[in-house]
Amino acid sequence: MFTLKQVINKSIQTSMKNGVMSSAVKRSFSTVGGINQPKSRKELSESFLDGTSSTYVEDMFANWVKDPKSVHPSWASFFESSERGVPAGEAFMSPPTLGSSVATKATPSTYTSSGSPKQVSDSMRLLLLVRAYQVRGHALANLDPLGLEVKEEPAEFNPAKYGFTEADMDRPIFVGEGFISGFLTNKQPETTLRQVLKRLKETYCGDIGIEYMHIQDREMCDWIRDKFETSQPVEIPDKEKIKILERLSWADQFEGFLGLKYRATRRFGLDGCESLIPGMKAMIDTATEDGVESIVLGMPHRGRLNVLANVVRKPLPAIFNEFNGGVISIEGEYSATGDVKYHLGTSYDRVTSSGKKVHLSLVANPSHLEAVNPLVEGKVRAKQHYSKDTEQKKSMAVQLHGDASVAGQGVVYETLHLSNLDNYSTGGTVHIVVNNQIGFTTNPKYSRSSKYCTDVAKTIDIPVFHVNGDNVEAVVKVCKIAAEWRQKFKRDVFVDIVCYRKHGHNETDQPKFTQPIMYDKIGKQQPIIEKYSNKLIAEKVITQEQYLQMKNIIHESYEKGYQDGMKHVPNAEDWLESRWEGFKSPIELGNPGRTGIDQDLLQKIGKVLYTEPSGFEVHSTIKRLLKEKKDMFDKGTGFDWATAEALAFGSLLLDGNHVRLSGQDVERGTFSHRHAVWHDQKTDQTYAPLTKLATALGKKDAAEFVASNSSLSEFAVLGFELGYSLENPDALILWEAQFGDFSNGAQVIIDQFISSGEQKWMRQSGLTMLLPHGYDGAGPEHSSCRIERYLQLCDSDPNKIPPKEEAERKQSQHCNMQVLNCSTPVNYFHALRRQVHRDFRKPLVIATPKYLLRYEKSFSTAKEFSNDSFTRLYPEAFPDQINKPEKINRIVFCTGQVYYNLIASRESNNIKDVAIIRVEQLHPFPFDLVAEQLQHYPNAKAIWCQEEPMNMGYWNYIYPYFISTFKHINRPADITYTGRPSSASPAVASHTLHKLQLENFLSNALTGQVGSK
């Protein structure tokens, strides 16, 4: 037996052979842009071949397959004819009222004596009308509480378009009995056009507008249809209505209370969209009942305080204390600058109305709208990883958006684009848009090119529920359905609450400067709480006295919270989650851990790295690399960068620390050096050696390794990994840029979160950024990670030199982040392990090499991996090949790969009076070690050499640090720059000019003379 599609396709093929193929087969109407009137009987039936348009007919076909007698004879005749290959447009005959200008002769084989072609025609025309509402009903929905837009009824809603007249409104139309869901669930074989139109308008053109017919998955469409297309409107129990009223009252009075107590304070209130609070709480209740134990929320400033108070349940005294200017003691707790109250985050355990517990986390965020989106997703993904929530049912993300920002900010799409990727999916996110129909002072027609602010949702095949924010029951309904959708399908969903903003952008703003008409209407608008309380009183759900009593109880709670807030003492512990207990704050001194590993462990890890699995056909080049890797472990020399990295990862995994590497092309590596994941050349199966460590070495407690190629996004993916790193300190989370040059695509994450997040929000992160950097003649777009920008973001004071005995520990914990440029694989190894083996966390930025990846003179020995710790500064590596320290005339300080250019040039020119020093850690600056080198060469002139232009790279950063160091050791402050001249572009495009520049500044650094011109 065939499916309906196969049956109809067979009849289409017959139509094509007979030359009667209608263009309507391809598409008789658009699922988004409206419906074109079918012009013939063929078009009428063929309309059902299009995706979700065949919903009802497919239901009947499925029943006909099981039992031909279960459907009306007219439909049985239609299916039977189609299965025999009768052309799709000839399987029934339309009545004269539809397409009468077209000849409509049916072949004798089309009908049986018991079948009525008119009944099939009636059914089809009715179902086309139903589908018109399914597709476009939202266009006529009553969504705007202000009624700013005058809507015209779409032409496809006119029954006359389908051949119906007023005389047909109450005429019985056959639809089937009991086997079709949706509107037709009343067990009646017939209905009337009037009845169906009534329910269509109630369902699709009421206070809820549903966009779902763009979704390609039939089951998903059916599920949504069944939720809304009930035969009768679903009544809400009185108990539920009272709960909604109470929650709405808490939201309303919160804004009123703040407005009364803090009249001149900006709070970015929720006035005009108070229904968000009962909607969110209903969504959380529904999700929790379905197994959700943890919810991470991300949201902008609008309504944030109300959500903190009434959804997350942050204690009221803490909120009011912040309004009163309360801050955490800097000396006693944490060196934090803090942030405005409507940016702050928090975490609390909440008990739902049914008694179930759910952990709620609101992620702190900056004013950069939507920038927090990927962090929320990353944090949820981490929760799912650590709780082994493989079904993604226990932890859920909820994102709140503004209408202007959700349409305008590109990171929204970048984050949505991660939603179905294997290593980034969180099993669906509930998105709620507080759509107050304005962006600061800009009207929607100037801030987006699409009809709805949520149209980005259609790119990933998810539903959008638009809802009138003044109908709090409708808001609650769609929020519940959104939670159910997420739990069932593990896909995102949007709830678009169309509302208004009672005040200006903030409470001190004058909105009538730019929106006089809108704010005239808002001024006359009856508050939501009044509308709903009056409704329930009129319905006798609650009395006026009971409602006043409810209001008084809520007001007393806010007043008590306000009074207690006067005495509230903030504590940094309120900001830290349990996994971070025991980690040191910036003003506490932690103990640096040993980063070296013993040689036996090194060899064991190595064997896993170079062993080819049986039955797995690796690429011939990788076979050669594996042989080379085995040789390096056998000989104890020649350890390259990829091997050093793998040893760091492997040893951390065996210590129980999760390692996650993410970014564009990271599995192989941009420069084909890493090969963390192998591909079978015959089956395309994959194999990641580091995932086999636990089994190979019998370590049951070894952690999981993940290397994952990401989407081609910097902003969202870096934000995702940052969010991931916030969840658990016992992990090494890395993001690698394809080239360091492209990292500025994530500049907002770097500026607003990574460099300043700890100081603003007391949230530590050990996120590591790997930024390929180096001047190899590849031109201006593939040379520089803009390292100067990271150094500019560093917060150390170049005029304050810490005591020598505590220099490294104090500097490391006081700084906001670390910036390195390692010159050896082994130091890179130690840097990675250091990230985890200490009791505090700091973001780490590493300018990683490119040509050094295969440069043997940079490689390390096996013994060096057993050294105790990371080396912040390398002294002269070949003291026996140059003069005695007092005879050294020039001491050249540098960092990164230019060191090897300097060494090669010094050797080829037989220069003996120059010492070359490598600064591996740029920030925190190693004052103590630089001072030792300057004192070791008392007669040498200090030079700073870099391959970057003078206005880029390290020079402007390191200069004041060197000056302070000179002063500290009582030596005349004198250091000279050598490198490329200042430039607007990071690098030249000409390889010839690149080499000439290199020769010139190397000569200048080593001799004081510019090379050949």
Curated annotation (Swiss-Prot):
Biological classification of the source: Eukaryota, Amoebozoa, Evosea, Eumycetozoa, Dictyostelia
The keyword rRNA processing is annotated on this UniProt entry: no
Gene Ontology MF terms: metal ion binding; oxoglutarate dehydrogenase (succinyl-transferring) activity; thiamine pyrophosphate binding
Disulfide bonds: none
Oligomer and partners: Homodimer. Component of the 2-oxoglutarate dehydrogenase complex.
Protein name per the record: 2-oxoglutarate dehydrogenase, mitochondrial
Domain of life: Eukaryota
Organelle targeting sequence: 1-39
EC number from the UniProt entry: 1.2.4.2
GO biological processes: glycolytic process; tricarboxylic acid cycle
Protein residues bound to Mg(2+): 403, 436, 438
Subcellular location: Mitochondrion matrix
Family: Belongs to the alpha-ketoglutarate dehydrogenase family.
Reaction it catalyzes: N(6)-[(R)-lipoyl]-L-lysyl-[protein] + 2-oxoglutarate + H(+) = N(6)-[(R)-S(8)-succinyldihydrolipoyl]-L-lysyl-[protein] + CO2
